[in-house]
Amino acid sequence: VAAADRARAVELLEANGYTVAILAQPDYRNVEEFRQFGQPKLGFLVSAGAMDSMVSNYTANNKPRSEDAYAHGGVAGHRPDRATNIYVQKIREAYKGVNVLIGGIEASLRRTSHYDYWTNTVKRSILLDSKADLLMYGMGEHSLLEIAALLREGIPARQIRNVRGTCWYTSRKE
């Protein structure tokens, strides 16, 4: 999430009595990076950052970018392709059964089936590919506080279905 957006989300959560730890641009190859703060009480909130990771990593000509404007020192190569998916995968490896919510620009833009420029295919929702429990899209401050309150009550993220600005899994029967 962009610094201002991240600060706003953290500010809102902390003002409402929640404790927040930020793991900014972790080494996605090392699962221990995701264990450094311990298992959270409510869950993980995952964002690829201020920009879609594929746009951040590649030019329109599909060439790797030499700089990353949103990485420390502007150095490219610290953010994986499809960062939301990779981060959720590492969290699932580190902690089985923990609530994982995704949001930010990458999740918002890929919440439904979408054309993927880099593979020239139509891909399904990032919620399905990432295996997160819940997707928040758009400006998520209000939904974030509502979801945090539900998680605090003990409702698993996969069962939250009444919050505006979210996407969730459903079966064909539903």
List each language-model region with its residue ranges.
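Glycine-rich beta-alpha loop elements in corrinoid/cobalamin-binding modules
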Residues: 5, 24-174
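Short helix-loop-beta junction
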Residues: 8-19
